[in-house]
Amino acid sequence: VKHTLPFFLILLVALADGCDRRSRAVSATGGCDESIKLPEGFCATVFAESAGPVRHLAVRKNGDVIAGVLDQRRTRGGLVVLRDTNHDGHADLEARVGEEGVHGVALGSDSSLYVSTATSVLHYRFGADLAPNPRYDTLITGLPQRRPQSHSLAIDPRNNLIVNIGAASEGCQPTPTPNTPGRDPCPELDSTGGLWSFRTDQTMQGLRNGVRIATGLHNAVALTVNPRDTSVYAVSHGRDMLHEFWPALYSDLDGATAAAEEMIRVASMRADYGWPYCYYSYFANQRVVAPEYGGDKHQTTRCGRQIQPLTVFPAHWAPMAMLFYTGTAFPPAYRTGVFVAFHGSALRAPLPQEGYVVAYVAFKDGLPAGETQIFANGFAGGMMSPEGAEHRPTGLAQDAAGALYVSDDKGGRIWKITWRGAGKD
């Protein structure tokens, strides 16, 4: 089922000024979106339509949904705040703030909002209005721009801000060319390839003011804090370009499948997860030395002391967000684990592209238990490719009632997933 805005509402939103905080009407109607395939008893309704290229989400206690929107071609970025005033499951009121693309969003207290741009983290405050006050504090400045859409955010129990800074290269080579060894030691690890912790009560901090809590992560875009154990978790993008950079060693099939996406828990300060010296081999089920550092697909020297992932996912699925479910609205089978949104692959040729799903990983005794379940599918539509997909999952959030929200940076849609009971549609 596809839903569209009436023309006059499209025109109203298009003409609105980006700095205008006035709330305005929006529309998304219809019942369950049958294009989104879910386990029996679940329903995905279109909460918002045409929100723009949305990355991450947050939900306030009052149910307002906050979305970070990227700059993309002629679409301005910034923050979008959406409200369902009549409680029908669809946003009917919208306010926008800012004109700079936003990737990460994280709520501190219910009135305190942190957002990341290409180079900064900004602190907004909510008052009585739908939108936050447009005057903000610059909490962090000068973040590396080499992978600007990677600055995901999370708040830890001590009210520190956790920031991902993705690595710019695949194997820390001085030039991205075939058969080029990596630099050893890798200077990129000084400022990228890990997670940093910053204080939330200081402004104009630079990278030097942060504390690196994890290193050796290629690009940990999916980032969260588990409320149950208060630990920082992430799902990191595995490396790319194994076949393109090392064609004599890796076939095109190797390049499509070898380097897994890794779910990790930050086990200790400055925990090391291997990049660029090692990567996790999906089929060998262990870390192996990267070819830039003399690896042969099997060698494991210098990888033994690096922390192993909790679980792994297929190569190139592109994990974008993760959320530990804490509600009681979903059945018990979905109350112990974590949802992961996958943007979908672009580099699995000669195999078909994969991903474009929301997966669920059950936990038991603090560890993943059982097989990964594809919880929500059908986002891509008829073609699984970055260009051909109708929608690509990016963000996850949960409201106070236990509904799950999923955002999309391709079609600009936000879904609200609820449990209606087995045998109901």
Name each model feature, range by range.
Residues 93-97, 102, 119-156, 164, ...:
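Asp-box/WD-like beta-propeller blade repeats and closely related beta-sheet repeat scaffolds
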Residues 64-68, 112-115, 160-164, 231-235, ...:
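Conserved beta-propeller blade signature
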Residues 21-38, 167-208, 216-219, 224-387, ...:
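Beta-propeller domain segments
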Residues 56, 104, 152, 219-222, ...:
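Conserved beta-strand position repeated once per blade in WD40 beta-propeller domains
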Residues 397-425:
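Blade-level signature of beta-propeller repeat domains, shared across WD40, Kelch, NHL, RCC1
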Residues 46-51, 95-100, 139-145, 211-216, ...:
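Surface loop/turn motifs at the tips and blade-to-blade linkers of beta-strand repeat domains
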Residues 50-53, 75, 93, 100-101, ...:
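Beta-rich catalytic cores
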Residues 59-63, 107-110, 155-159, 224-229, ...:
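Residue-level detector of Asp-centered blade-edge/turn motifs that repeat once per structural unit
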